[in-house]
Amino acid sequence: MEYSELYVKRIRSLCQKRGITINKLATMSDVKQSTLDNIVRGLTKNPRVKTLHKIALAFNMTLSEFLDFDELNAYSFEDDNDD
């Protein structure tokens, strides 16, 4: 799994657990619908920290809580060529 896919998985998982659509998340986070769609569809590979922070706040989480999940913590950068 690519690094950028981990954010998508996290966002989708939290939306599903909380019964929130991506459209609703865009409204709650004050992130443009198109920006969030691009992240979720994998078109934006490296979302800005500010964007992730807004998404985290919409989930009532700190940025560190949002980024603290098993798949991301276990990710190995050995085969990753992105900088």
Model regions and ranges:
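A short, Lys/Arg-rich alpha-helix, primarily the initiator
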Residues: 1-21
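The alpha-helix within a helix-turn-helix
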Residues: 15, 26, 56
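DNA major-groove recognition helix of helix-turn-helix
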Residues: 15, 40, 70
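Residues in the helix-turn-helix
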Residues: 24, 35, 65
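Recognition helix of helix-turn-helix/homeodomain-like DNA-binding domains
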Residues: 31-46
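Short, charged recognition helix plus adjacent turn
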Residues: 45, 67-83
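DNA major-groove recognition helix of helix-turn-helix/homeodomain DNA-binding modules
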Residues: 50-65
